[in-house]
């Protein structure tokens, strides 16, 4: 059908992250192993902090102008306020763009890190329909103008699905496995 098309300006937008594991455009899944995390994951927050340190000051091009990636060119999102506050504490940068998935609806950033936070299905603080929501996943990933990195524990994919809709929701996360770093 090919009805959905990118705006021509997107071809002129690029980042040069100079990272082996994360290319300069696309979606990337970073598996993170942790235990007993429900609404907060220090492991995921520290990984995001490390990647932010690596990409700050790298080049990006927009409107045919080269610029340096600043902290406000990076967005960090999580499904839970507790992880948002944890990211703010660990990053310790006031100008950092950190919030829940819902907060940034309609906004964009060069690079987006998505911290899914919970360790496994037993540690989900809310129902599967909230956590695995296709719409919320789409909103989170589509905030990225160039690069989206989603961090989650692969144990989340072992969710015990009781309904067809739950299978579909978890399956959307299974599809992210092909973008594994």
Give, region by region, the residue ranges found by the protein language model:
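Helicase C-terminal subdomain and adjacent C-terminal extension
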Residues: 121-181
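A short beta-strand element within the Helicase C-terminal
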Residues: 99, 107-119, 139, 147-151
